[in-house]
Amino acid sequence: MKFKLKRIDWYIIKQFLGTYIFAIALIIAISVVFDINEKIDKFLSPDVPLKAIVFDYYMNFIQYFANLFSPLFTFIAVIFFTSKLADNSEVIAMLASGMSFRRLMLPYAISAGIIALSTFVLNAYIIPPANATRIDFQNKYIKNKKVDYVRSAQLEIEPGVIAYFDRYDARSGMGYRFSLEHFENKKMISRLTANSIKYDSLYNWTLIDYMIRDFDGMREHITEGSRMDTTLTIVPSDFLISVNDCETMTSSELSTYIDRQKKRGIGNIQTFQIEYHKRFAAIMAAFILTSIGASLSSRKIKGGMGLNIGIGLALSFSYILFTTVTSTFAINGNLSPAMAAWIPNILYTFIAIYLYRKAPR
């Protein structure tokens, strides 16, 4: 059976998306004003070009925060315009004309689908390169959060080949107390050590004051030297990991990076895994929060629109808070990144089902 969209459907879709865009514009405008006020001292520096502030920072700042709080804007939009419809008795008129609440939800679902698809495309492909530009600006002119120093970095660069840096400084491109161990059938067959190692270019390194020990049964062959150029399938970015790095990768890059780091035995990748799963969880969040908002605000109540908006804001902020809490547990506890991303959606799905059943018929 085909559903033909009626004038009322287009009216609801227009109201939904219009209110959503208005909410984004309003909140982002306020956020930009507060951000300028906070960073005005940095921006007034003669070293910071106005063009970079506008195009490298704020153009990308707006995209990032608009998409980050998309669930909140979706919820506010639904609550606001549905409460207005209910307050004007328009919802009652629709239901009295024979339209079921389920049918009434169709334009809401279409609008949520448009927002969900837009959010996914932005998250997966458009915002990551924009974030790279924004974060580069922040690191250069505001506060450098880029990781350029690491201690005790160990990773498996190939099956049975373990590399270890006691410390590495990206500013000089130098690593210290480096070792490279080769294993076959769980037995060490060679061990290379160097007082220092310098990164040259992609996979090209220079060993300084090195020693190679090759094991052949009970025999040991030692080779020493002051300098040697070699090729290692690692680059500094493999172990110089910043929390912000996950925001600069497209979803395909994120998936490839996670798989590569897992194979190399690097453990601190929970933030990257959470970011990857969140991008898919955000698709469902648009539908869940739309259902909650429509079900909650479609009934005309004594408190009017203000009460509905208050309840809606409380629920939306609790959703964001719950998402933050589960992410923290995944990073610092035993909760899996996939569960951390999806638990808020699962919980709020039950809330959506309950409110849907209680909605006016």
Positions of PLM-derived features:
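Structural signature for solvent-exposed beta-strand/loop edge elements and short helix-capping sites
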Residues: 157-210
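Short C-terminal domain-edge/linker segments immediately following a structured domain
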Residues: 195-198, 209-213, 228-229, 237-242, ...
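Transmembrane alpha-helices
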Residues: 1-159, 170, 218, 236-361
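Generic detection of short hydrophobic beta-strand segments and adjacent strand-loop junctions
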Residues: 3, 220-234
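A short, polar/proline- and glycine-enriched secondary-structure boundary/capping micro-motif
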Residues: 187-190, 216-226
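A short, charged
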Residues: 199-221, 241-249
